Amino acid sequence: MSLTPPKSQYVIALDVGGTRIKAALIGSGGSGTELLYETRRATDREGGPDAVVEGILDVAGQLRTYGIEQYGTGPAAAGVAVPGILDEPTGTAVYAANLGWRDVPLRTLLTRRLGGLPVALGHDVRTGGLAEGRIGAGKGVDRFLFVALGTGIAGAIGIDGRLEPGAHGSAGELGHIVVRPGGPECGCGQRGCLEALASAGAVGRAWAAASGDVSAGAADAARAVESNDDRAIAIWRDAVDALAAGLVTALTLLDPRTVIIGGGLAEAGDILFVPLREAVRARVTFQQLPMIVPAALGDAAGCLGAGLLARDLLSAEVSSR
């Protein structure tokens, strides 16, 4: 936290997750992503979608008030990253299973709560990918693919400093590439999806079943691999093989120069990256092998990306005048 007044405009940044909201005030020092103040709060899913929305509006309002009190001027804009399906042109959060909402006019609600402030809305994984591409592991790379391995799996396609949302806002849903036809059932209704086999959630469930520890997760599986537990090694090898299959499909279609891997499973470090690089290399034929690197920004990527969205919005407004 810093109480130093920002050198110029600062923005509100929100990263809304299934369990918590990460929020920050971001100044324009250095790369334009100077963290001036950070806070976190529970998402309050138990209270239902209305409570989730009110929590977002409340923390945004608190950040605006804090900024005015500390710096003597209000924020210039706000950026918010949310999960699920978005209609970015209208600023509508169309659907998010983990938050329970449908067709929430989130940009309008935030603009109203923030006294008319311009608000940018973005998909959480694409927003994290934006930050990694501009100021993180993909900085200076013209074509990259950011893949988040968390409870699920999703990707973001980076092209010359911007993220490609697709025609309907669903580009990069790598988790629902079928890599094992007839495999485990996925939440989307298909079987054998990458997400059902290689996400941190899938690895954690497999290790919990194998170890008999119902509270075990992917991090426990990684530690067991380090300890040369044969059961964990088999589970890990299966997940890495599935992930390599999904990545080769993606690089065949997209031809990225760099693949950036983030999310909880990436925290395993070389336990993941060494066999994954080998598995991808073994599968490619005519494709150019990309660099496969860990994400650099950790769980700050979403907030930093939301700040970049807000700054892009300001830049667009200036250029349109």
Q: Across the structure, where does each feature detected by a protein language model lie?
A:
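A charged helix-plus-loop insertion that forms the helical arch/lid used to bind
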Residues: G91-R102
